[in-house]
């Protein structure tokens, strides 16, 4: 099977289903990205508006991101084109940011937490693309408002409902359809309701890889969002927000195939299901011209379950109730103050009957058939609280100082933390800004690592230090550029332990240089033709390493890609047509090679002998995506995409036979065509 980013058992084992799916029919699955967009003039706006109180941030317009070629109209899929973001496989857009893992990130949508942001391993996001107004990413030393993460903070802003009339949208693509209805309900009330369902499972019932002996049902996903907004005046707003997402995939491993021969216990039917549902009431009140507050009270339920052949079943249900509040005060001359806090209570319900290999990213030899069988069915309550304070101080017209502090308490781990965040900005001219930031961050261990019976309740959090220095400049004609140098270290990664199940026993480092060159529409310039060409080019040079404390062994991080380059261009040719391209390339991802055999397992299977952890690399990756948008009428438009236009045979990994004597290459997406239609109502 291909290398996988996620190694925690309750995360990794369900991901086998996604691996099987992408090995068999990657073109069909990748088309789940599709969502149409119009053909208006396109620029990709990269600013720091949402995280302007800290360096190391990027903000992008959702409408513009939706037209990045290869994203299928989904703004969130386009984030992989940003500097510092690594993805190891075409089948997933889940981002590994600046040397951290995808599950080291935290996600918020309009001040509210969400269960997950991407369907079925990252093929498409869980929010209607027509609702996404802005996307922001903080990748180092971010504001103390955000915690419980050492990777990055993703903050999505949805637009409010229209208030002029009842209207909507219909979106159709090769893989699914979504519908949006919105409008006013009187003078002070407005609403939107959106729903989406994939339909490639209705077109192709199943697929099979005969050599691997795996047949599967194509994955099914749904999502929905709803908002009821009450705005009695310009200073006071109350909204009710709801969102849901579901994902399901099923497959069967047949006896006699390669997959069953390598690990017999996976033989039989398997499935994975995940879902979340969240609802919240949010009050936003501008108490004066200098003081504002927003408060959110909400609840979220997450369900994750899977069955893996004869290896067993697992179910995890999490019910979270939270209260968040954020104050903003600008009445103190030269200061922008932000302060608030969060109370969170989480009920974790775990039922497990499974051969449980305690695999982490530090264990290449993960065999399910020989793993111990574990049973548990119990609940646990986790309570967390935090307070934070930040000040953006305009020292003079050129200098800005930023200081913040986050205090948090975790009753589950019985630990307290104080995390300072510091920043400095210097603008010698109106268009040139130097910035620097430093922050301490922490993240609790994964639930399966700290849950008793299967984990270690005494695990300490992962801790990280972030430092970043950057410079940005705006130039004439719509040109701008930005560069950042960053360094991160991570301490307290969990490793398997035969007595404690897990212990804190590994650390990591990440350093890099990022460069972004961007072209926007020039003020007063043409809006069509070659003079309206916009886009950006990004380059990341980085190094990410992991170290096992007990042995001192060092090796590259799973998503270590020393060179990442991306070019995105958009050309609004006329009122009806616009064109775009995206070319991306990166160093091959590291993997742990099989260098021979090492006897047999107790059941007689050949036992592989692995080389050094991540000691070899896949071939370099590169791909070209093309896009054309066509507006037929004011309300009807379409897009057409050619993915992997020159049919580069990028390598996803390698598959071995049961004797580990023959290796086959597993390829990523071939060339394929996709399209989508949009009708405004």
Where are these regions (language model features)?
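Gram-negative outer-membrane beta-barrel transporters
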Residues: 394-400, 487-489, 504-593
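Membrane-embedded beta-barrel scaffold of Gram-negative outer-membrane proteins
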Residues: 294-298, 304, 427, 434-435, ...
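Flexible loop and strand-edge segments within Gram-negative outer membrane beta-barrel domains
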Residues: 217, 237-286, 297, 301-320, ...
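Structural signature of Gram-negative outer-membrane beta-barrels, strongest in the C-terminal barrel
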Residues: 243, 330-336, 342, 376-488, ...
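Transmembrane beta-barrel wall of Gram-negative outer-membrane proteins
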Residues: 173-197, 212-250, 271-293, 331-337, ...
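Surface-exposed extracellular loop regions of Gram-negative outer-membrane beta-barrel proteins
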Residues: 303, 349-367, 426, 430-468, ...
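Periplasmic N-terminal accessory/gating domains of Gram-negative outer-membrane beta-barrel systems
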Residues: 47-143, 153, 157-160, 514, ...
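C-terminal beta-signal and adjacent terminal beta-strands/loops
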Residues: 533, 585-605, 621-623, 629-681
